[in-house]
Every structure is written in structure tokens, then in C-alpha cells.
Amino acid sequence: CGEGDLQSTLESCYQNLETNQGSSKYLPDSFNGRLAGILSGDVAINPHFSDWTRIIFMYCDGAMYQGHKAAPVSYKSTDLYFRGQNITQERFNWLNAKYAINTNATDIILAGSDDGAIGALLWANHLQDAVKGKVRVIADSGVLLDVVNPTTKRPHFQDAYINIMKLSNVEVGTPCAECNTKYPTERWRCLFFENLYATVKQSMFVVDSLYDEESFGISLGVDCIDSFGTLDLCNATEKASIEGYKSGVVNLLNKATAISGNGAWAPACVTRGGLLTKPTWTDNTFQTPMNSGYTIEKSVNNWFLGVAEPEKYKHVDTVSWPNNAPCSGVTTLQRSLMTE
């Protein structure tokens, strides 16, 4: 729930209290029939992972599944609790008590989308130290660049992460001891993928859009993308800003995938978030490269199996919009599925 200033951050956390991101009271009684993508139990949709034990860690306090503050923060006569580290650790303890994952699990995929992507990366080393099986990480839509918004003249996400740390991390560091050591006085940096990925010891797979419309709006102040996911309404200055940001994401993904065992799937398509758990998982409209047959599902499976040829699981689009044509002018129906 981080925002550009501390007051806005508190307000955002407060607003989350009455949503499923802030309280289990608003969660459905069952997720049966609600899960898609890599979480689906349908073998036709999820042929390689549908028979796995799938556990969902719902969000609680808006601090990326980490941080701890013993005393609540009072805001608008309401107590806000920031205890993501203890909550996540207790979930791991519960999994071990119920499934004996510390000794029985041979393969574990720790995956997350958006803030959950950073949460998965932060906890990966800790989880691997606790279990005998092999831990792998999938980070979906978690690559946000530390840049200055030209409209506000402020680095939005840097400000937001500093505020999160002020609220939740005065008493503890992040779950990633290696990143804490790397940035002892600026631990907020560990909430950025660009600073975190190299400290993760496990094999990781990164899923992201090279044209993340929400990032453009928040980081760049660009709000020209139309309802069909095109840049047709953007002027030359806006397109140049978008392409500059996209180049930064490409460079970062290329660095991350240069590490042995790491993979990626990043199309030159305009979309946003949760690509692992939406119809985009197997949708042939979304392939990287275009018409290559490499959907997210196929690329992730090749990475998981450890195929020898990296070109089968390292797919960062080399073109710009709209040159991955099938996903550059999607229909209204497809668009509604992508943004649900």
C-alpha cells in the first residue's frame, strides 16, 4: 500500500482494510472454479502443474509479505498492523505441519504477482535454507524501475518503498539477509527487482510485459494508452518516454537472464499484472517471440524441466510495439479478460 508520501501510504493501507487485500473477512469461502493459469486444476489449461499442491498466500498488510512492527499504527481511530514477516513465516510453519514440506517436498515453486513477485524473491533464500527440496521462483509483473516521474519530479516507487520501510521495517530487515547486507542503510532498495534479483540464489523465471500500462502511468505520468491496449493515442513525446522505460526493463531482464538457470517471458504487448493466473497463461495471442509457439505456459515448463537450450525459456521480446502483432490490437473481450 505504499504511496508517494507517508500520509497517502497510511490512507492506502486504511482503504485496504475493507478489501481482500487487507482482511480475510472479504475472501471467498472457496477458490474452486476461480483459479486460472498456473493455479488452475484443469489439466487442459495447466497440463504440467494442475496436479501439484497449490497454496495461495493472500495479501495482508501491503508491505510485500515482509516487515514487522510490534505496536499498531493508529490512523483515523483505527489500528493498522504491519506484521508481514511473522504472518508469512507462520504460513510456512503451517505448511510444514500439514504437508511436511521441509522434508517431503521435492520441488517447490514460490511464485507471486506484482508485490507478491517481490515477496517471493525476498523469501526464496530463506525458504531454501529451511527445506530439503529444490526451490524455484517465478516473479510475475514485479519489475518496476526506480525512475523520476517527469510530471511530479519525484521517484514515485522509491518514495513509496521508503514509506513502507518507515512503517514496517524499523524493527526488522527484509527476509533476504543477503540484500540486507548489500544495502544496510537503504533497505528500501531491496523492494526493487533491479537490486534484489542478484541476491537470490535460486533459479528464477521472470514474467513481465515490456509495456506495463500501470507502470507508465505511475512512473512516467503517461496516460495515453487506449482501452484496446494500443499506443495509438500517444504523442511522439509520450512514445519516446515509454520506449525509454521499456529499454530499461529489457536491459534489466537481459542481465537477470544472463545468470545460469534463469528464464523470462516478456512480450512487447500492452498489458498489466497477474499474467501467470489469467487466460494469458496459455493464450496463443500472447507469444514471445511472435508466432514462435512460446506461451507463458510452454516457456515456464521448459525452464522448470531445465532443458539444455536457453533459447527455449529465455524470451525477452526484441521488437517494439506494435511489432508483436497478435497481441498489439487485442479485442475488447480479450482486453476484459486481461484486466479482470
Model-identified regions with their sequence ranges:
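C-terminal His-loop and adjacent cap/lid subdomain of alpha/beta-hydrolase
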Residues: 1-340
